[in-house]
């Protein structure tokens, strides 16, 4: 599905007044630095992947979750769906339409450092609206602490504390948590978060375990349907 016109324009206007977008990378690939990188997939996709922010390869292709971390996710998904190894880049890319892909901020930051809380707060109402209005699913696999705790932004104190406490649990990568989101118009929905670590080689504690953790999540979700 296409990004709703009003939402796309609102994101572009917000990006135009946001410092820290990695302009040289966008220029190197002749990409518009105001164009949000969001992989909407099917509105009825049963599963959403929620990450931190796009990287260099995401800018190159204009799609989220297509770089090294995203390739790990896609390889596990392909193997789970087809029982075979992903044959090539395009096969992984084709998986995109079967899922909903979104980040805390849909623009690449300079140096691939996480966006500040101020920037995440600025974009949060629009990304929240996208989740509530443009996707009909419930289950969200969050990748990393930044993505998981995005769901605490703008929440009542009790909900924030519940999210923060959940992240401290030893079983956080096998358990799940329901969270309510409400947009500016008062439309509310309940989502179920299934957190996983960020699939980055820099995250040595969890990097090697990530494929097995994601496969376990996918099996859990298959069993719950």
Predicted regions and their residues:
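A polyanion-binding, active-site-adjacent surface
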Residues: 2-173, 179-224
